[in-house]
Amino acid sequence: REGATALMQQYDQRRLRLFAVVLFLGIMAANLGRYLIFDGLYLWDARLRWQECAYVLHGLNPFDVMHSRVPSIESIGWLDASLGGTVPWAYVLGNVINPGFLPYSAMCVYILALDFIAPLVTALCMGRFLLRHRYVQDKYMAVLASLLVFAPSMWANAVLFGNQSGIVCCCVILSMCVLEDSETLAGLLLAVAMCKPQVAFVFLFPLLCKKHWKAI
């Protein structure tokens, strides 16, 4: 009887953890749905970053286009100097997130897909990382913890505006998860994340202290 009781308690705990995971996903989906219904899909940031990358691929300095030193390209559009501008290397690395070689409509589909695929891949890798290093013992808790990449409400805003922040954060998390297996891959992911150095730069210091030279 005691064994049966213990099994039932364990079963109930698993059901509770599974319910927590499903509830968490439901809250995140509802939050995104609320923004979509009441605010709509803007993708303003995505368009701006795409324009900058596209001009660079056409051999033009986006800052020259912004300040009307060179004429804009009709198929790309004019750049607003009050909104545009980022770190110089992001005009090249940014093509991974906002590919300037694609038409704008195709880029919109691409970044929306990336906004969902990147967190899912990150959650999978993070869950495996947590289990492998025994930060958690239960797979349901590992799933719940890894799904925290969807937790900030700003993730929904990043989707609506096509902002790079959510994808950049995923790159940072992935780089830390794969560091032990491949410093080169970790470094490449961190390089893409440097499109937003205010997010990624701080992670170079622990890599430096741990002497992960390849990643740096």
What are these regions (language model features)?
Residues 7-9, 201-216:
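Perimembrane helix-loop-helix junctions
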Residues 16-131:
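TM-lumen/periplasm interface segments of multi-pass membrane proteins
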Residues 113-118, 166-171, 196-200:
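Membrane-embedded alpha-helical segments of multi-pass membrane proteins
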Residues 121-141, 180-181:
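Transmembrane alpha-helical segments of multipass membrane enzymes and assembly factors
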Residues 130, 139-155:
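Transmembrane and membrane-interface helices of multi-pass
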Residues 135, 165-167, 172-185:
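Membrane-interface transmembrane helices that cradle and orient dolichyl/undecaprenyl
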Residues 157-165:
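Short acidic/glycine- and proline-prone juxtamembrane loop motifs at membrane-interface regions
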Residues 184-208:
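Membrane-interface alpha helices of multi-pass inner-membrane proteins
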